[in-house]
Swiss-Prot record:
Known role: Catalyzes the reversible phosphorylation of UMP to UDP.
Any one GO MF annotation of this record: ATP binding
Catalysis performed (reactions): UMP + ATP = UDP + ADP
Name by which UniProt lists this protein: Uridylate kinase
One term under GO cellular component: cytoplasm
Residues annotated for UMP binding in this entry: 54, 74, 135-142
Pfam families, sorted: AA_kinase (PF00696)
Activity regulation: Allosterically activated by GTP. Inhibited by UTP.
Listed NCBIfam families: pyrH_bact
This protein's pathway: Pyrimidine metabolism; CTP biosynthesis via de novo pathway; UDP from UMP (UMPK route): step 1/1
EC annotation from Swiss-Prot or TrEMBL: 2.7.4.22
Name of the gene this protein is made from: pyrH
Length: 241
């Protein structure tokens, strides 16, 4: 553990990252790759909490824009995050990594209800904990869930695992060839520069609790381990103002 910079982490995995190139659904090969990457960090003794998005299956905001009641649409999105979490649990356990899924909406037949003290105990015992169901409340994103769970379990960092994006840029590098990649930012920089890394609620929660973020490309093998060891491969967003 002496070479590890972050000993307890929240890994935020977008739903799109689990879909791979298809863009929708769950790609078993992506799950297998991600599970192997997580296992390599788990083998180093790092305590790992994971928050999955659900955008590969459903987005509450999209449903609301199509005329659905927003709360109902958001609940559907929460269920999508749980499906992703169960898929990732299966991938991890196939590699021998002890894993627990905790959901903010009770469904005891398939997962534990979220209990903070129990989650921390799982981490201390070397189990990976996957947090499903978002915050359990509509109108809150899974980015906010990641910030909330990070604060609750006293995580050292939130790792924002992006699908093919290796950091935060001043503009979309696919559109603007002059886009500048930032190596380090503050939470206030995100707001003042209007950089869409996470929503304002999640950003404020991270800033208020002094939790740093690292935005990096999860598709490149070894990147999760590199970030945990402190290598500068993405963009670090300092937790303070």
């Amino acid at each position: 553990m002496s070479q590890v910079k972050y000993k307890r982490i929240i890994l935020k995995v977008s739903g799109e990252a689990l879909a791979g190139e298809k863009g929708t659904g769950i790609n078993p090969e992506v799950i297998k790759h991600l599970a192997e990457e997580i296992k390599s960090v788990h083998d180093m003794g790092v305590e790992i909490g994971i928050v999955c998005g659900g955008g590969n299956m459903w987005r509450g905001e999209t449903g609301a824009n199509l005329g659905m009641e927003r709360a109902q649409a958001d609940y559907m999105g929460m269920l999508a995050t749980i499906m992703n979490g169960l898929a990732l649990q299966d991938g991890l356990e196939n590699l021998g990594v002890p894993t627990r899924v905790q959901t903010s909406i009770e469904m005891r037949q398939i997962a534990e209800p979220y209990i903070r003290r129990k989650a921390v105990r799982h981490l201390e015992k070397g189990r990976v904990v996957i947090f499903g169901g978002g915050t359990g409340n509509p109108y809150f994103s899974t980015d906010t869930t990641a910030a909330l769970r990070a604060a609750e379990i006293n995580a050292d960092v939130i790792l924002m695992a992006k699908n093919g994006v290796d950091g935060v840029y001043s503009a979309d590098p696919k559109v603007d060839p002059n886009a500048k990649k930032y190596s380090e930012l503050t939470q206030l920089d995100l707001i003042s520069k209007n950089l869409k890394v996470m929503d304002s609620t999640a950003s404020s929660l991270s800033m208020d609790n002094n939790i740093p973020l690292v935005v990096f490309n999860v598709n490149k093998p070894g990147n999760i381990k590199k970030v945990v060891m402190g290598e500068n491969i993405g963009t670090v967003i300092k937790g303070d103002k």
